[in-house]
Amino acid sequence: MVTNFNGILLFRRDYRERDMLIKFLTAEYGKKMFFIRGARRRGFKMAAELLPFTMGEYVGDLRDQGLSYINSVKSVQYLEHISQDIALNAYATYVMNLMDVAFPDNQPVGRWYQQLTSALQLIDQDVAPALVANVVEIQLLQPFGVAPELRWCTVCGRSDLPLDYSESYGGLLCQQHWHLDPHRLHASPAAIFYLRQFSVLDLAKVHSIKVKPRTAAELRRILDEIYQNSVGVRLKSKRFIDQMGSWYQPLAPRKNED
């Protein structure tokens, strides 16, 4: 079926001597793998439009099974700052990898196309990339099959008491029921607050995110435990982010920016 589609380029892979496989998350049809003949040849006409960290509108032959094909590019947005900054690159790669793992190929992803678009645009603007990644991680728990209860206590339904996260109970426990799980995460009220807020945050409406460093570090710890113990997903791009803190030095602020 030859049709217009909107897509986010998730990754590229060399194929044979002169060709390439490119996976897109499409707004209409979910994840699709495209065969790009001659993409590695010098002078390939769509080379600039099929760079990493691009999104746009395309015309292609989309197949229900097997590889699809791109005929032409109608418009494209290049996330330039992500491509130039190793930290932004790392967080963008991580959230795209999570999306790739969370959803099967060839199935529409609904609101997640816009949520990933917004996440990448915020990261490209250097708007709290680590926290944007946290939002994606928290909201992807449901597609991963974990779906913790973050609205109220899983035992009694109360939300007016201090809350903590329990992996055993699949979500929050209020203070009256903390004794039920001695291995609860012992999270601070601030970390639980942002865990709950981020679970419903629409990134399209976000212009800035500010969280104290101590709370951000605790949120990172909580999500690492949940992903390790409940989700079971450990990506190379996440390990790179974990290691990056020991050697990465941010670039100087870009000129003409606040």
UniProtKB/Swiss-Prot annotation:
Alphabetical list of SUPFAM superfamilies matching this protein: ArfGap/RecO-like zinc finger, Nucleic acid-binding proteins
Keywords, in A-Z order: DNA damage, DNA recombination, DNA repair
Highest rank taxon of the organism: Bacteria
GO biological process: DNA recombination; double-strand break repair
Gene Ontology, cellular component aspect: bacterial nucleoid
Pfam families: RecO_C, RecO_N
Record function comment: Involved in DNA repair and RecF pathway recombination.
HAMAP family: RecO
Family, as annotated: Belongs to the RecO family.
Protein name: DNA repair protein RecO
Species in which this protein is naturally found: Lactiplantibacillus plantarum (strain ATCC BAA-793 / NCIMB 8826 / WCFS1) (Lactobacillus plantarum)
Phylogenetic classification of the source organism: Bacteria, Bacillati, Bacillota, Bacilli, Lactobacillales
